[in-house]
Amino acid sequence: LLVATGARERSLSFSGNTLPGVYGAGAFQTLVNRDLVKPCENLFIIGGGNVGLIAGYHAIQAGINVAGLVEAAPECGGYKVHKDKLARSGVPIYTSHTVLEARGTDKVESVVIAQVDRQFKPIPGTEKVIDCDTLLIAVGLEPVNEFLQIARTIGMDVYSAGDANEIAEASAAIFSGKIVGNEIAKKLGKDLPDIPASWMETEEILKSKPGMIVPETYIDKLEGVFPVFHCVQEIPCNPCSSVCPKDLIYIDEADIRHLPYFNEERADECIACGRCVAVCPGLAVSLVDFRKRSQTALVSLPVEQN
């Protein structure tokens, strides 16, 4: 038996959380991304993980104003590149804050937030009232694994994969399914080689939390053409290096959490194709081109349309 039932969203208890206009992130993203429905005009987000950060950016693309985002921890738990996209769009991000209540008569009309101390308790006198018509709750996921646990207690030969086994990014869930599928096939008698140790290492890399943030560095020259990387946090990501037709962008394939760098020794081979700019999911690559003017560069920036 393979259990790959995914995860469910965690709920959050606060006054007014049953008012119309309080959404889980999954329902909100389904409406916006799949059904192309604009469910609100003025959104406030609770939770600074990747789900909340990405949902906020999707809302902006759908023409929805994001009035703010609240995160109880001192820093957002999601990738910095996703947080930066919201910050560049002018979204206020309130770290070390929590939601106290949603206000409204027949629907959400505003939200009350407050700063928290180190024990995550609200600090009196720090309350803020923010107008909004919708609250998006994105405070984490938990595995849908009840059936898995029951199967184990009665002695069934059972496996789990993806978020039903461990909450992680989608890429990690897909890779864990590949590993477990291989294990099951061997158990059923298929003549397959042992799972390479590199697969297990890759799975751990894909499941890893955001790493350290390093100071942003720049190429100090006024000639030629070259990319500038604005990703300064170690996360498992390598699209920019994989699409470069000249192999001028390098990320250590043994551990794709390492930051990318441009091979300046071969900089004259760059053809300014812009693929690295277009492919970056964090919009964290720009292209600087001094070939026409030595003192004024043509800069290509990533923009995602509504």
Say what each PLM segment does.
Residues 1-306:
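Residues forming the flavin
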